[in-house]
Structure formats: C-alpha cells, structure tokens
Amino acid sequence: MVIDVTNPLDFSNGMPPSLLPEYSNTWSLGEEIQKHLADAKVVKALNTITAKLMVDATLVNDANHNLFICGNDGDAKNTVKQLLADNFSWKAENILDLGDIKYARMTEGIVPFWVSVMQQQGTAMFNYLVVR
C-alpha cells in the first residue's frame, strides 16, 4: 500500500503556486503514481493539510475537521482510515472518502487555494470542515 501525500505544485512563478499543467483537471499525480505502481494500492490522503496536522489532528478545532481520501481499493482506504484514527487522532467520521483515485484531481486542485489561505491567515494550522 502507498499513501500518497504529494501535490504537483509549480513554484516557478513564485507564490502562490499553480498546479503543473499536466496534472490539472484531467489527470493527477495520484493517478500517475497508481499507473506506475500498478500492483500497489494507492491511497491519496493528507495532501490538503500542513505536516504538523497530518500527524496530530487535535491541533486544530479539537480534531473536528475533515480529511479527504481517495483510492481504488476499499480495503486499503479502510486501513488508512484506521491508521490515521489509531495513531494521529483523526476521527473516523471526519475522514471523507471521495471515491476512486481520479478524485485526487480534486484534492490536488484545492492546494493552491490552501496556500493562498495560509498566506492570508499567516498560519498553516487550519483545515476544512464540511458542514451538513
């Protein structure tokens, strides 16, 4: 199993970054990893937050915020959910499964926006919460 936390960001024009053109809208780095590691179970996770929050969900809003994951294998996604809950204080009900690995396009796509918010707020210690 591979947990993909990467983002295809282009900083060549400074901040905020843009997505590398080949990974915008119709393809993702998550899909590229799955393509090259065809036998692996790739789960895209943790790529929309700062590193400190990846390993301690309680640092923001007492862990009441969402984490997005996606991948082609349901068992692998469940394993990642359990790993995150058991080791990094993520609440299972706050981990939102978006579907198969093509949804990495969406999570990678919001990262330039995340960087803009981080710049405006002056901190990377924030996350998204889907309110229903």
Question: What are these model-predicted stretches?
Answer:
Residues 1, 40-41, 65, 93:
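A structural micro-motif
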Residues 3-59:
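Rossmann-fold NAD(P)-binding glycine/threonine-rich loop
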Residues 53, 62-132:
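Active-site-lining helix/loop region of Rossmann-like oxidoreductase modules
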